[in-house]
Curated annotation (Swiss-Prot):
The name this protein goes by in its record: [PIN+] prion protein RNQ1
Coiled coil: none
The keyword Cytoplasm belongs to this UniProt entry's keyword annotation: yes
Organism of provenance: Saccharomyces cerevisiae (strain ATCC 204508 / S288c) (Baker's yeast)
Modified residues annotated as Phosphoserine in this record: 143
Free-text domain note: The prion domain (PrD) is a Gln/Asn (Q/N)-rich domain, which is unstructured in its native, soluble form, and which forms a parallel in-register beta-sheet in its amyloid form.
Length: 405
Protein backbone atom coordinates (compact mmCIF):
# COMPACT_ATOMS: atom_id res chain seq x y z
CA UNK A 1 0.00 0.00 0.00
CA UNK A 2 1.13 3.59 -0.63
CA UNK A 3 2.94 5.25 2.28
CA UNK A 4 0.92 8.45 2.04
CA UNK A 5 -2.31 6.49 2.09
CA UNK A 6 -1.17 4.58 5.20
CA UNK A 7 -0.34 7.84 6.92
CA UNK A 8 -3.73 9.25 5.92
CA UNK A 9 -5.56 6.24 7.36
CA UNK A 10 -3.54 6.55 10.56
CA UNK A 11 -4.64 10.15 10.95
CA UNK A 12 -8.24 9.11 10.35
CA UNK A 13 -8.14 6.40 13.01
CA UNK A 14 -6.56 8.78 15.52
CA UNK A 15 -9.22 11.38 14.97
CA UNK A 16 -11.90 8.71 15.43
CA UNK A 17 -10.34 7.55 18.71
CA UNK A 18 -9.05 4.25 17.28
CA UNK A 19 -5.56 4.76 18.70
CA UNK A 20 -4.55 1.16 18.37
CA UNK A 21 -5.46 1.11 14.71
CA UNK A 22 -3.59 4.35 14.18
CA UNK A 23 -0.48 2.71 15.64
CA UNK A 24 -0.91 -0.23 13.27
CA UNK A 25 -1.18 2.03 10.19
CA UNK A 26 1.83 4.09 11.24
CA UNK A 27 3.81 0.87 11.67
CA UNK A 28 3.00 -0.17 8.14
CA UNK A 29 3.96 3.28 6.87
CA UNK A 30 7.33 3.22 8.69
CA UNK A 31 8.09 -0.19 7.16
CA UNK A 32 7.37 1.06 3.62
CA UNK A 33 10.65 2.99 3.30
CA UNK A 34 9.20 6.50 3.82
CA UNK A 35 10.92 9.70 2.73
CA UNK A 36 11.92 12.51 5.08
CA UNK A 37 8.58 14.36 4.78
CA UNK A 38 6.61 11.20 5.38
CA UNK A 39 8.87 10.34 8.36
CA UNK A 40 8.20 13.79 9.82
CA UNK A 41 4.42 13.21 9.56
CA UNK A 42 4.80 9.79 11.18
CA UNK A 43 6.86 11.33 14.02
CA UNK A 44 4.19 13.94 14.68
CA UNK A 45 1.42 11.35 14.92
CA UNK A 46 3.55 9.20 17.30
CA UNK A 47 3.91 12.11 19.72
CA UNK A 48 0.14 12.80 19.62
CA UNK A 49 -0.66 9.20 20.47
CA UNK A 50 1.94 9.29 23.29
CA UNK A 51 0.20 12.33 24.77
CA UNK A 52 -3.12 10.55 24.68
CA UNK A 53 -1.63 7.55 26.50
CA UNK A 54 -0.12 9.76 29.19
CA UNK A 55 -3.47 11.46 29.70
CA UNK A 56 -5.23 8.12 30.06
CA UNK A 57 -2.93 6.19 32.32
CA UNK A 58 -4.44 3.71 34.73
CA UNK A 59 -5.64 5.00 38.08
CA UNK A 60 -5.55 3.69 41.62
CA UNK A 61 -2.66 1.51 42.68
CA UNK A 62 -1.33 1.28 39.16
CA UNK A 63 -1.09 5.07 38.97
CA UNK A 64 0.74 5.24 42.30
CA UNK A 65 3.15 2.55 41.16
CA UNK A 66 3.56 4.29 37.84
CA UNK A 67 4.43 7.58 39.49
CA UNK A 68 6.78 5.93 41.99
CA UNK A 69 8.59 4.13 39.20
CA UNK A 70 8.84 7.23 37.08
CA UNK A 71 7.31 5.36 34.19
CA UNK A 72 5.40 8.31 32.81
CA UNK A 73 8.38 10.59 32.51
CA UNK A 74 10.62 7.93 31.01
CA UNK A 75 7.86 6.95 28.63
CA UNK A 76 7.37 10.50 27.40
CA UNK A 77 11.09 11.21 27.21
CA UNK A 78 11.52 8.15 25.04
CA UNK A 79 8.68 8.96 22.65
CA UNK A 80 9.46 12.67 22.45
CA UNK A 81 13.13 12.14 21.58
CA UNK A 82 14.28 12.92 18.07
CA UNK A 83 14.33 9.89 15.79
CA UNK A 84 17.10 11.53 13.74
CA UNK A 85 15.66 10.47 10.45
CA UNK A 86 15.73 6.75 11.26
CA UNK A 87 12.69 4.70 10.39
CA UNK A 88 14.06 1.93 12.65
CA UNK A 89 13.91 4.29 15.64
CA UNK A 90 10.34 5.20 14.74
CA UNK A 91 9.47 1.51 14.58
CA UNK A 92 10.86 1.18 18.13
CA UNK A 93 8.54 3.93 19.36
CA UNK A 94 5.56 2.32 17.67
CA UNK A 95 6.49 -1.06 19.22
CA UNK A 96 6.53 0.59 22.64
CA UNK A 97 3.07 2.10 22.07
CA UNK A 98 1.68 -1.24 20.87
CA UNK A 99 3.11 -3.00 23.94
CA UNK A 100 1.54 -0.51 26.36
CA UNK A 101 -1.84 -0.75 24.67
CA UNK A 102 -1.80 -4.57 24.52
CA UNK A 103 -0.69 -4.92 28.14
CA UNK A 104 -3.37 -2.54 29.39
CA UNK A 105 -6.17 -4.21 27.41
CA UNK A 106 -5.22 -7.63 28.81
CA UNK A 107 -5.78 -6.43 32.40
CA UNK A 108 -9.59 -6.28 32.00
CA UNK A 109 -12.28 -3.66 32.10
CA UNK A 110 -11.97 -2.90 35.82
CA UNK A 111 -8.73 -1.02 35.32
CA UNK A 112 -9.25 1.10 32.26
CA UNK A 113 -6.11 2.93 31.30
CA UNK A 114 -2.56 2.44 30.18
CA UNK A 115 -0.07 0.87 32.60
CA UNK A 116 2.99 2.73 31.39
CA UNK A 117 5.20 2.17 34.43
CA UNK A 118 5.06 -1.62 34.29
CA UNK A 119 5.98 -1.72 30.64
CA UNK A 120 8.83 0.73 31.06
CA UNK A 121 10.18 -1.18 34.04
CA UNK A 122 9.97 -4.38 32.03
CA UNK A 123 11.82 -2.86 29.10
CA UNK A 124 14.48 -1.20 31.25
CA UNK A 125 15.18 -4.50 33.05
CA UNK A 126 14.88 -3.08 36.57
CA UNK A 127 12.09 -3.87 38.97
CA UNK A 128 12.32 -0.60 40.96
CA UNK A 129 12.53 2.06 38.29
CA UNK A 130 12.51 2.84 34.59
CA UNK A 131 14.88 4.53 32.21
CA UNK A 132 14.44 6.44 29.01
CA UNK A 133 15.45 4.76 25.81
CA UNK A 134 17.59 6.49 23.24
CA UNK A 135 17.68 6.04 19.49
CA UNK A 136 19.92 2.98 19.67
CA UNK A 137 17.73 1.37 22.33
CA UNK A 138 14.61 1.96 20.28
CA UNK A 139 16.25 0.49 17.19
CA UNK A 140 17.18 -2.62 19.18
CA UNK A 141 13.64 -2.79 20.54
CA UNK A 142 12.22 -2.65 17.03
CA UNK A 143 14.55 -5.37 15.84
CA UNK A 144 13.51 -7.66 18.67
CA UNK A 145 9.83 -6.81 18.37
CA UNK A 146 9.54 -7.29 14.63
CA UNK A 147 12.04 -10.10 14.15
CA UNK A 148 9.21 -12.51 13.34
CA UNK A 149 6.49 -9.99 12.68
CA UNK A 150 6.74 -9.18 9.02
CA UNK A 151 4.82 -12.26 7.95
CA UNK A 152 2.29 -11.90 10.75
CA UNK A 153 1.66 -8.29 9.87
CA UNK A 154 1.19 -9.16 6.21
CA UNK A 155 -1.28 -11.86 7.14
CA UNK A 156 -3.22 -9.39 9.26
CA UNK A 157 -3.34 -6.89 6.46
CA UNK A 158 -4.48 -9.58 4.03
CA UNK A 159 -7.24 -10.67 6.36
CA UNK A 160 -8.39 -7.08 6.72
CA UNK A 161 -8.42 -6.55 2.99
CA UNK A 162 -10.31 -9.79 2.45
CA UNK A 163 -13.04 -8.72 4.84
CA UNK A 164 -13.45 -5.45 2.99
CA UNK A 165 -12.22 -1.94 3.29
CA UNK A 166 -12.80 0.14 6.39
CA UNK A 167 -13.33 -1.80 9.64
CA UNK A 168 -11.95 -5.14 8.44
CA UNK A 169 -8.66 -3.71 7.28
CA UNK A 170 -7.97 -1.74 10.46
CA UNK A 171 -8.97 -4.52 12.80
CA UNK A 172 -6.79 -7.10 11.12
CA UNK A 173 -3.69 -4.95 11.19
CA UNK A 174 -3.67 -4.26 14.95
CA UNK A 175 -4.52 -7.86 15.78
CA UNK A 176 -1.26 -8.95 14.23
CA UNK A 177 0.56 -6.14 16.04
CA UNK A 178 -1.00 -7.10 19.36
CA UNK A 179 0.11 -10.69 18.85
CA UNK A 180 3.65 -9.48 18.34
CA UNK A 181 3.40 -7.35 21.47
CA UNK A 182 2.19 -10.30 23.53
CA UNK A 183 5.04 -12.51 22.33
CA UNK A 184 7.46 -9.69 22.99
CA UNK A 185 6.23 -9.18 26.56
CA UNK A 186 6.31 -12.89 27.32
CA UNK A 187 9.88 -13.17 26.13
CA UNK A 188 10.89 -10.14 28.19
CA UNK A 189 9.15 -11.46 31.30
CA UNK A 190 10.99 -14.77 30.99
CA UNK A 191 14.29 -13.03 30.45
CA UNK A 192 13.67 -10.73 33.40
CA UNK A 193 12.78 -13.64 35.67
CA UNK A 194 15.90 -15.47 34.59
CA UNK A 195 18.01 -12.39 35.23
CA UNK A 196 16.45 -11.87 38.67
CA UNK A 197 17.15 -15.47 39.59
CA UNK A 198 20.70 -15.22 38.37
CA UNK A 199 21.39 -11.93 40.14
CA UNK A 200 19.19 -12.51 43.20
CA UNK A 201 17.85 -15.76 44.54
CA UNK A 202 20.28 -18.07 42.84
CA UNK A 203 23.34 -15.92 43.42
CA UNK A 204 24.06 -17.68 46.70
CA UNK A 205 23.20 -20.97 45.06
CA UNK A 206 25.77 -20.25 42.39
CA UNK A 207 28.32 -19.36 45.05
CA UNK A 208 27.42 -22.49 47.00
CA UNK A 209 27.80 -24.57 43.85
CA UNK A 210 31.16 -22.97 43.15
CA UNK A 211 32.25 -23.53 46.76
CA UNK A 212 31.11 -27.15 46.63
CA UNK A 213 32.97 -27.72 43.40
CA UNK A 214 36.01 -25.98 44.81
CA UNK A 215 36.02 -28.03 48.00
CA UNK A 216 35.35 -31.22 46.09
CA UNK A 217 38.19 -30.49 43.72
CA UNK A 218 40.47 -29.69 46.66
CA UNK A 219 39.47 -32.89 48.40
CA UNK A 220 40.21 -34.84 45.27
CA UNK A 221 43.46 -32.97 44.87
CA UNK A 222 44.45 -33.59 48.48
CA UNK A 223 43.48 -37.22 48.12
CA UNK A 224 45.50 -37.45 44.95
CA UNK A 225 48.41 -35.73 46.65
CA UNK A 226 48.19 -38.14 49.55
CA UNK A 227 48.02 -41.04 47.16
CA UNK A 228 50.96 -39.64 45.26
CA UNK A 229 52.86 -39.25 48.52
CA UNK A 230 52.12 -42.84 49.44
CA UNK A 231 53.15 -44.01 46.01
CA UNK A 232 56.28 -41.92 46.26
CA UNK A 233 57.14 -43.43 49.63
CA UNK A 234 56.51 -46.89 48.26
CA UNK A 235 58.61 -46.03 45.24
CA UNK A 236 61.41 -44.78 47.45
CA UNK A 237 61.21 -48.00 49.43
CA UNK A 238 61.52 -49.97 46.23
CA UNK A 239 64.44 -47.84 45.17
CA UNK A 240 66.19 -48.47 48.48
CA UNK A 241 65.51 -52.17 48.18
CA UNK A 242 66.79 -52.17 44.63
CA UNK A 243 69.85 -50.24 45.72
CA UNK A 244 70.58 -52.83 48.41
CA UNK A 245 70.07 -55.70 46.02
CA UNK A 246 72.20 -54.04 43.40
CA UNK A 247 74.88 -53.52 46.02
CA UNK A 248 75.01 -57.19 46.88
CA UNK A 249 74.69 -58.49 43.37
CA UNK A 250 76.90 -56.03 41.57
CA UNK A 251 79.42 -55.85 44.40
CA UNK A 252 79.55 -59.58 44.94
CA UNK A 253 79.88 -60.45 41.31
CA UNK A 254 81.92 -57.50 40.22
CA UNK A 255 85.26 -59.02 41.15
CA UNK A 256 84.43 -62.25 39.37
CA UNK A 257 83.38 -60.57 36.19
CA UNK A 258 86.34 -58.22 35.90
CA UNK A 259 89.64 -59.71 34.70
CA UNK A 260 91.68 -57.21 36.74
CA UNK A 261 89.73 -57.63 39.96
CA UNK A 262 87.71 -54.40 39.75
CA UNK A 263 84.44 -54.16 41.66
CA UNK A 264 82.24 -53.63 38.60
CA UNK A 265 80.08 -50.85 40.07
CA UNK A 266 79.96 -52.03 43.68
CA UNK A 267 81.02 -48.68 45.07
CA UNK A 268 78.63 -46.77 42.83
CA UNK A 269 75.79 -49.00 44.03
CA UNK A 270 76.77 -48.38 47.64
CA UNK A 271 76.92 -44.66 47.01
CA UNK A 272 73.48 -44.75 45.38
CA UNK A 273 72.07 -46.69 48.29
CA UNK A 274 73.63 -44.29 50.78
CA UNK A 275 72.17 -41.33 48.93
CA UNK A 276 68.70 -42.91 48.87
CA UNK A 277 68.97 -43.76 52.56
CA UNK A 278 70.18 -40.36 53.59
CA UNK A 279 67.59 -38.53 51.47
CA UNK A 280 69.68 -35.41 51.43
CA UNK A 281 69.20 -34.90 55.17
CA UNK A 282 72.16 -36.70 56.79
CA UNK A 283 75.49 -35.15 57.67
CA UNK A 284 78.68 -35.34 55.71
CA UNK A 285 80.25 -37.67 58.25
CA UNK A 286 77.60 -40.29 57.59
CA UNK A 287 78.26 -39.90 53.88
CA UNK A 288 81.98 -40.41 54.50
CA UNK A 289 81.16 -43.45 56.60
CA UNK A 290 79.19 -44.98 53.75
CA UNK A 291 81.98 -44.08 51.36
CA UNK A 292 84.52 -45.80 53.62
CA UNK A 293 82.30 -48.86 53.86
CA UNK A 294 81.97 -48.81 50.12
CA UNK A 295 85.75 -48.69 49.69
CA UNK A 296 86.25 -51.55 52.17
CA UNK A 297 83.62 -53.62 50.42
CA UNK A 298 85.24 -52.74 47.12
CA UNK A 299 88.64 -53.99 48.32
CA UNK A 300 87.00 -57.12 49.71
CA UNK A 301 85.25 -57.81 46.44
CA UNK A 302 88.50 -57.16 44.57
CA UNK A 303 90.33 -59.68 46.78
CA UNK A 304 87.57 -62.21 46.29
CA UNK A 305 87.73 -61.59 42.58
CA UNK A 306 91.49 -62.11 42.51
CA UNK A 307 91.26 -65.29 44.60
CA UNK A 308 88.56 -66.61 42.36
CA UNK A 309 90.62 -65.62 39.34
CA UNK A 310 93.69 -67.48 40.66
CA UNK A 311 91.52 -70.44 41.45
CA UNK A 312 90.14 -70.41 37.95
CA UNK A 313 93.65 -70.15 36.52
CA UNK A 314 94.77 -73.11 38.62
CA UNK A 315 91.82 -75.12 37.46
CA UNK A 316 92.53 -74.17 33.89
CA UNK A 317 96.18 -75.18 34.27
CA UNK A 318 95.16 -78.43 35.83
CA UNK A 319 92.72 -79.01 33.03
CA UNK A 320 95.47 -78.08 30.54
CA UNK A 321 97.75 -80.79 31.91
CA UNK A 322 94.98 -83.26 32.45
CA UNK A 323 95.88 -85.30 29.41
CA UNK A 324 99.45 -86.07 30.58
CA UNK A 325 98.68 -86.24 34.26
CA UNK A 326 95.70 -88.49 33.77
CA UNK A 327 97.92 -91.05 32.11
CA UNK A 328 100.34 -90.96 35.05
CA UNK A 329 97.47 -91.15 37.47
CA UNK A 330 96.08 -94.15 35.67
CA UNK A 331 99.45 -95.87 35.77
CA UNK A 332 99.89 -95.08 39.44
CA UNK A 333 96.42 -96.31 40.22
CA UNK A 334 97.09 -99.55 38.40
CA UNK A 335 100.45 -99.92 40.10
CA UNK A 336 99.05 -99.30 43.54
CA UNK A 337 96.21 -101.66 42.90
CA UNK A 338 98.52 -104.44 41.74
CA UNK A 339 100.87 -103.98 44.67
CA UNK A 340 97.98 -104.02 47.05
CA UNK A 341 96.78 -107.31 45.64
CA UNK A 342 100.30 -108.73 45.61
CA UNK A 343 100.95 -107.71 49.17
CA UNK A 344 97.72 -109.26 50.28
CA UNK A 345 98.60 -112.58 48.61
CA UNK A 346 102.22 -112.41 49.55
CA UNK A 347 101.61 -111.59 53.15
CA UNK A 348 98.89 -114.17 53.55
CA UNK A 349 101.07 -117.12 52.61
CA UNK A 350 104.29 -116.14 54.32
CA UNK A 351 105.58 -117.99 57.33
CA UNK A 352 108.23 -116.24 59.33
CA UNK A 353 111.38 -118.07 60.29
CA UNK A 354 113.29 -117.46 63.45
CA UNK A 355 115.04 -114.42 62.01
CA UNK A 356 111.79 -112.86 60.72
CA UNK A 357 112.64 -113.18 57.06
CA UNK A 358 109.62 -114.13 55.03
CA UNK A 359 109.54 -117.26 53.06
CA UNK A 360 109.01 -116.84 49.35
CA UNK A 361 106.82 -119.83 48.98
CA UNK A 362 103.78 -120.87 50.89
CA UNK A 363 105.28 -124.39 51.09
CA UNK A 364 108.76 -123.33 52.09
CA UNK A 365 110.30 -124.40 55.35
CA UNK A 366 113.03 -122.48 57.08
CA UNK A 367 116.24 -123.98 58.22
CA UNK A 368 118.21 -123.05 61.31
CA UNK A 369 119.83 -120.10 59.56
CA UNK A 370 116.59 -118.70 58.30
CA UNK A 371 117.53 -119.33 54.71
CA UNK A 372 114.64 -120.45 52.69
CA UNK A 373 114.85 -123.85 51.34
CA UNK A 374 113.17 -124.65 48.16
CA UNK A 375 110.66 -127.36 48.33
CA UNK A 376 111.66 -128.95 45.17
CA UNK A 377 112.92 -128.64 41.71
CA UNK A 378 110.79 -127.19 39.08
CA UNK A 379 110.46 -129.17 35.98
CA UNK A 380 109.49 -128.02 32.55
CA UNK A 381 105.80 -128.19 33.23
CA UNK A 382 106.07 -126.07 36.34
CA UNK A 383 105.65 -128.94 38.88
CA UNK A 384 107.96 -129.39 41.86
CA UNK A 385 109.55 -132.72 42.75
CA UNK A 386 110.25 -133.12 46.46
CA UNK A 387 112.88 -135.24 48.22
CA UNK A 388 112.94 -136.66 51.70
CA UNK A 389 115.69 -135.87 54.21
CA UNK A 390 116.22 -137.55 57.51
CA UNK A 391 118.81 -136.57 60.02
CA UNK A 392 119.89 -133.64 62.14
CA UNK A 393 121.93 -130.63 61.35
CA UNK A 394 124.37 -129.53 64.02
CA UNK A 395 126.14 -126.25 64.70
CA UNK A 396 129.06 -125.60 66.93
CA UNK A 397 129.21 -122.34 68.75
CA UNK A 398 132.22 -120.42 69.94
CA UNK A 399 132.28 -122.19 73.26
CA UNK A 400 132.75 -125.50 71.62
CA UNK A 401 129.37 -126.71 72.36
CA UNK A 402 127.36 -128.27 69.72
CA UNK A 403 123.74 -127.61 69.41
CA UNK A 404 121.45 -129.99 67.72
CA UNK A 405 118.20 -129.28 66.15
Amino acid sequence: MDTDKLISEAESHFSQGNHAEAVAKLTSAAQSNPNDEQMSTIESLIQKIAGYVMDNRSGGSDASQDRAAGGGSSFMNTLMADSKGSSQTQLGKLALLATVMTHSSNKGSSNRGFDVGTVMSMLSGSGGGSQSMGASGLAALASQFFKSGNNSQGQGQGQGQGQGQGQGQGQGSFTALASLASSFMNSNNNNQQGQNQSSGGSSFGALASMASSFMHSNNNQNSNNSQQGYNQSYQNGNQNSQGYNNQQYQGGNGGYQQQQGQSGGAFSSLASMAQSYLGGGQTQSNQQQYNQQGQNNQQQYQQQGQNYQHQQQGQQQQQGHSSSFSALASMASSYLGNNSNSNSSYGGQQQANEYGRPQQNGQQQSNEYGRPQYGGNQNSNGQHESFNFSGNFSQQNNNGNQNRY
